[in-house]
């Protein structure tokens, strides 16, 4: 007879082993929950969200050398970063007026100068009546200047008589006056008591007489951010005016020169920017803004807080559902902490 083999031990845990394993798992799980609670990713996410939106606006201000802003809505928890974005540039290397955005133009009577501000330039000096250039911007919906804009160009006049250099679809423009002054203007949108929007009278700024001379290139910049209309010549502000109105829509072509009286000079390096939403975000449901948060944070062209509005660092408070609080600090140089 063959001896009976003793059956092998079945695989598995004894009761004691099972209790020990469950105890270890419970201990590890408890430690993990504690660590996650301490980390609180929801709170960190809300804090990082606000910081990132502020940094995005500041970076835009520095990159474009133009003001940028962040709007905070305590009621909805919405954060909107707004800054300048280039809509189109024209370098006038050909009479086809090739635009960077595909918005090419038509030139009547103008000629190209080889010694422009940057490369070639478009000139109407000595051109016959009716000479001008135009680009049909009113057909491009992306050219929306409602929240603000920036116009940059180089001008060189050959006559002290001056003339109209630029008219952006009857919404904004630049003029050179015969007394040597510069004028920048825009047309605001006004809304009646019944809610009907229409074009208002122009808002304009004029420099002191004698800021420009015939025969020299000058760099002209006009900036409007629904707070200040600024006019700068060769990097120096020469005029400003306060306004908070939105800009009226572009409803006609961009006109370079004047069909009635040709511009007595040349233009080069034209760029048009508009204020656009560069980012939007909403705080998580369990987080809200503190009641004392500023509704708008404005960064200057150099990235610092606008010194006309803020003389000290800004504190933006966040309040959490569990009663905890946190703050984001923006110092006077625009650094977000």
Regions found by a protein language model. Name each.
Residues 2, 9-36:
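N-terminal single-pass transmembrane signal-anchor helix
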Residues 85-96, 150-159, 261-278:
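Extracellular, beta-strand-rich glycan-interacting domains
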Residues 123-149, 202-211, 258-259:
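Short surface loop/edge beta-strand patches of beta-sandwich-type extracellular domains
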Residues 216-230:
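Localized edge beta-strand/strand-to-loop motifs within extracellular or lumenal beta-rich domains
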Residues 87-114, 124, 168, 277:
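Short, tryptophan-glycine- and acidic/Ser/Thr-enriched carbohydrate-recognition patches
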């Amino acid at each position: 007879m063959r001896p009976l083999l003793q059956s092998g031990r079945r695989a598995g845990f004894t009761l004691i082993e099972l209790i020990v394993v469950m105890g270890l798992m419970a201990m590890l799980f408890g430690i993990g929950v504690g660590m996650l609670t301490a980390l609180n990713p929801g709170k960190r996410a809300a804090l990082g969200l606000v910081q990132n939106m502020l940094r995005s606006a500041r970076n835009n201000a520095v990159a474009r050398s133009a003001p940028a802003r962040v709007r905070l809505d305590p009621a909805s928890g919405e954060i909107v970063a707004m800054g300048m974005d280039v809509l189109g540039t024209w370098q006038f290397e050909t009479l086809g007026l090739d635009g960077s955005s595909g918005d090419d133009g038509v030139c009547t009577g103008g000629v190209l100068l080889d010694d422009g501000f940057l490369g070639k330039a478009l000139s109407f000096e000595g051109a016959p009546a009716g000479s001008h250039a135009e680009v049909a911007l009113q057909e491009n919906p992306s050219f929306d200047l409602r929240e603000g804009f920036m116009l940059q160009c180089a001008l060189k006049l050959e006559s002290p008589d001056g003339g109209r250099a630029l008219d952006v679809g009857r919404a904004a423009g630049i003029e050179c006056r015969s007394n040597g002054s510069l004028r920048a203007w825009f047309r605001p949108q006004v809304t009646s008591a019944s809610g009907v929007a229409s074009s208002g009278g122009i808002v304009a700024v004029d420099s002191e007489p004698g800021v420009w001379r015939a025969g020299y290139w000058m760099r002209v910049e006009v900036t409007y951010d629904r707070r200040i209309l600024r006019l700068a010549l060769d990097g120096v502000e020469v005029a400003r005016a306060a306004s908070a109105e939105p800009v009226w829509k572009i409803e006609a072509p961009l006109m370079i020169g004047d069909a009635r009286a040709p511009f007595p000079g040349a233009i080069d390096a034209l760029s048009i920017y508009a204020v656009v939403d560069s980012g939007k975000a909403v705080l998580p449901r369990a987080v809200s803004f503190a009641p004392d948060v500023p509704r708008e944070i404005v960064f200057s062209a150099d990235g610092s807080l606008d010194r006309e509005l803020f003389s000290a660092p800004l504190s933006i408070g966040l309040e959490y559902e569990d009663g905890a609080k946190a703050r984001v600090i923006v110092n006077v140089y625009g650094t977000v902490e």
